[in-house]
């Protein structure tokens, strides 16, 4: 097995399942953990466009099982071409586990 694939399989991670219909994006952040935990989940959504700025923040504590992808929430956003949007998902057990991932990835236009 490729070393990179093996490392990905052995590490906890946050991923985003994204679909788009016109200007409407549906974004589902998922977390997969190597060990189960009682984790604090924070989802921060920032948006800036011609109509102004908005920021929303969701926080909750979840009991997350190991080795299976868990959908954390479902976001549906109407994003115009001139809008700048950033979603940051953080999962932490307050000790050794701290994951954070941004959508869109910094290599994409936001």
UniProtKB/Swiss-Prot annotation:
InterPro entries referenced in this protein's UniProt entry, alphabetically: Curli_assembly_CsgC/AgfC, Curli_production_prot_CsgC
Induction field: Under control of the CsgD transcription factor, part of the csgBAC/ymdA operon.
One GO CC annotation: periplasmic space
Keywords: Chaperone, Periplasm, Signal
Keyword tRNA processing: no
Source superkingdom: Bacteria
Entry-linked Pfam families: Tafi-CsgC
Subcellular location field: Periplasm
Keyword Ligase: no
Signal peptide (UniProt feature, chain positions): 1-8
Entry's family note: Belongs to the CsgC/AgfC family.
Known function: Plays a role in the extracellular assembly of CsgA into thin aggregative fimbriae (Tafi) fibers. Assembly may also require CsgE. Tafi are thought to be assembled via an extracellular nucleation-precipitation (ENP) pathway, and possibly also via an intracellular non-CsgC-dependent pathway.
Protein name as it appears in the record: Curli assembly protein CsgC
